[in-house]
Regions:
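Short acidic, Gly/Ser-rich segments with clustered Asp/Glu that frequently serve as metal-coordination loops
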Residues: 1-8, 194
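A cross-family phosphate/adenosyl-ligand binding-site feature
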Residues: 11-78
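Short beta-strand segments
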Residues: 24-26, 84-87, 118-119, 152-153, ...
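Short glycine-rich anion-binding loops that position phosphate/pyrophosphate groups of nucleotides
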Residues: 29, 63-64, 87-90, 216
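Short, Asp-centered acidic motifs that coordinate Mg2+ and/or phosphate
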Residues: 81
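Glycine/threonine-rich flexible loop motifs
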Residues: 90-99
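Glycine-rich phosphate/pyrophosphate-binding loops
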Residues: 109-128
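Electrostatically charged, flexible surface regions
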Residues: 128-217
Length: 217
C-alpha cells in the first residue's frame, strides 16, 4: 500500500533525478492483483501526508492500475514517466503476469507514457543501492521509451546488469481447506526455477540485475 517501505525508498531515489514527483498508490497491499480495474464499486481517494517533504501523496482505494489511470484522468497529473514499486519480492517469469506492480507500469504504457517497474528480493531492499547505477545505465543506453515497460529486478548483491527476456516459471499451486471451511491458495516455492539462457530468472540466480523490456503484445 501507499505506506509501504518500497514506495518511500523509490521516491527518495527518484527525487534526485526528477523535479516534479507525485505519489498515487493503493491504500492497501495489492499483491497478485494483476491488471484489474475497479468497476463495480466506488473508490475513495485521500490526499495524505507527503511520503517525503514536497511530494504530494494520494491514497486510492483501488488497484495499482487504477492509480495510474486515476492520476491521469481525475487528478490531471500530466506525468512523463511512471515508476512502480519497489516491490517486496522479485517479479520474474510468470510472476509478472500476476503482478500489480508491473500492471501499473503497463497501464502507463497503454497511455503512451514511459514506465519502469522495480522489484527486490523478498524482505530485503538492500538491492536498491544499485538504483543510481541502473537508472544511469537505462538513460545512457536509451532503453526508456513509450513502446516497452522496463521490468527491473535487483538482487541483494549484484555482479552487473543484464538485459533479459521474461522466462517461463510454473509453480505448483494447490489449495488447503482450513477449520473455517475456506480454501487457501498455496504455492510450492521449492519448484525448480527455469534456467533458460538470457532469461530474467537465470540472471537473478547468477547474481545479476535483470532489466527486461516488455511490450504490450
Amino acid at each position: 500500500g501507499v505506506k509501504a517501505e518500497g514506495i518511500k525508498i523509490l521516491v527518495e531515489k527518484i527525487k534526485q533525478y526528477e523535479k516534479d514527483v507525485f505519489v498515487v498508490a493503493p491504500m492497501y497491499e495489492q499483491s497478485a492483483s494483476s491488471h484489474r480495474l475497479t468497476l463495480r464499486r466506488g473508490m475513495n481517494c485521500e490526499r495524505i501526508d507527503d511520503i517525503i517533504d514536497g511530494v504530494p501523496t494520494y491514497a486510492l482505494d483501488g488497484t495499482p492500475a487504477d492509480c495510474v489511470l486515476f492520476a491521469l484522468r481525475e487528478l490531471d497529473i500530466n506525468f512523463d514517466i511512471v515508476f512502480s514499486g519497489i516491490n517486496k519480492g522479485y517479479n520474474l517469469g510468470d510472476d509478472i503476469i500476476y503482478s500489480g506492480t508491473f500492471a501499473a507500469a503497463q497501464e502507463a504504457l497503454m497511455r503512451d507514457k514511459k514506465a519502469i517497474a522495480m522489484s527486490c528480493k523478498y524482505n530485503s531492499f538492500e538491492g536498491t543501492k544499485y538504483f543510481d547505477e541502473v537508472y544511469k545505465y537505462i538513460k545512457e543506453n536509451d532503453l526508456l521509451n513509450e513502446r516497452v515497460v522496463l521490468n527491473v529486478n535487483f538482487p541483494a548483491n549484484a555482479k552487473g546488469i543484464k538485459i533479459t527476456h521474461q522466462a517461463k516459471s510454473t509453480y505448483k499451486t494447490y489449495y488447503i481447506k482450513k477449520e473455517d471451511n475456506l480454501y487457501y491458495t498455496m504455492c510450492d516455492t521449492t519448484t525448480p526455477l527455469n534456467d533458460e539462457p538470457n532469461g530474467d530468472i537465470q540472471a537473478i540466480k547468477n547474481g545479476y540485475i535483470s532489466i527486461s523490456p516488455l511490450g504490450i503484445n
